[in-house]
Amino acid sequence: MEVTNTSSIMWFFRDKGFDDPSIDKMLRKCKQLEKAQSDVASENWDYLSNIVGIQERKLPYIVSRCPKILTLRLDERLIPMVECLSSLGRNPREVASAITKFPPILSHSVEEKLCPLLAFFQALGVPETQLGKMILFNPRLISYSIDTKLTVIVSFLASLGLDQDGMIGKVLVKNPFLMGYSVDKRLRPTTEFLKSSVGLSEDGIKSVVMNFPQLLCRDVNKILKPNYDYLKECGFGDSQIATMVTGYPQILIKSVKNSLQPRIRFLVQVMGRGMDEVASYPEFFHHGLKKKVESRFKLVKKNNIDCSLREMLDCNTKKFHEKFGFSEVTASF
C-alpha cells in the first residue's frame, strides 16, 4: 500500500512541476508523505490556491518548505487555521502573505497553539486590534514555546523596567520579531553594551526599547560597536553619544559609510556647523541628505537666514516655507 501511495504522490508532485531531487528532499523531510494520498494532496493544493488565494507560482515554494501541509486533513487542520487567521486580519491577502512567509503555520493547531498564543499576548496588554497584525506580520511566533521561549523574553523585558502600563505589549507590537531572539546570545549582550559602553541610564534603556526595540536585536560587534566607535572618532563626548542614542537610537544602526559619514561631512564642511549642534539634534541623521538637508540649506543660505538645525529640518515642507516666508517659486530655484 505504501509503495502505491508513494508512487501516487510522486506523480502528483511531477504534475505540479517538481523535479525528482526536490521530491526526494521533501520525502526525507516529511516521512508522512510516503503514506500521503494524492487526492488529499490535490484537495489541499487547490484549497490554498483557489480559496486562500496563494499564487500558483508560490505554492511549490510553500510546499517544499512544509510538505506536511499536503498530508493534513482539510477540515481538521487547514480550514480552522485559515479561518482563524482570516478573523485576525483586515485583508484576505494578509493570510496568504503570512502562509508564504512561514508555511509551517498551517501545521499547527488552533486550539493547542494559536489560541494560547493570542491569550498570552493579550495578557501582556496587546490590544485585540493589534493581535492579528502581530501574528500575520511575524507568523513564526506560533512556533515558539510560551513556557521556554516567550516567557523568558517577557521576564527579561520586565527586568528592564518595562513591567507597567502594558509597556511590553507596546514593544512587541512595534517589533514582533524581537520574540525570535535569544536573551543570552543577543538581547542581554546588546543591553549591557548600551549600559556599559554607551552609558545609558535605566530610564535611557527604557526609552530606547520603547521607541525603537529593533536596536536590541542588532549584533554588538558587527553593528553597534562600529557605529559607536565612529561617533567617538568624530569627537562626540560620552554624554553626547548617550544623549544622541536616547534621542535617536537608529544612529547606532545607520550605515557609517552611506549615512553617517556623508551627513557629518556635509554638516561640517559645507554648512560650517559644529558637532555640538547635531549632538543636541540627533534626528539630523534621519533626514534625507539631498532631498531635505541640502535643498533646505541652500534656501536658508541664499536668503541669509540664521537658524538652528532643528528649526530648519523639524517640520514638513509647507511649514518650512511658511516659517521662513518662502514661496513655491522661491523654493524651486
Curated annotation (Swiss-Prot):
GO molecular function: double-stranded DNA binding; RNA binding
UniProt cross-references to Pfam families, sorted A to Z: mTERF (PF02536)
Disruption phenotype: Small white seeds, with defective choloroplasts, that are unable to germinate on soil. Albino seedlings that die rapidly when grown on synthetic medium.
Any one annotated GO CC term: mitochondrion
Gene Ontology biological process terms in this record: DNA-templated transcription termination; regulation of DNA-templated transcription; tRNA processing
Subcellular location field: Plastid, Chloroplast; Mitochondrion
Gene3D superfamilies reported for this sequence: Transcription termination factor 3, mitochondrial (1.25.70.10)
Its job: Transcription termination factor essential for chloroplast development. Required for maturation of 16S rRNA, 18S rRNA and 23S rRNA in the chloroplast. Binds to a specific region within the tRNA(Ile)(GAU) gene at a position adjacent to and downstream of the 16S rRNA gene. Required for the maturation of tRNA(Ile)(GAU). Binds to double-stranded DNA.
Name of the protein: Transcription termination factor MTERF6, chloroplastic/mitochondrial
Species of the source: Arabidopsis thaliana (Mouse-ear cress)
Gene: MTERF6
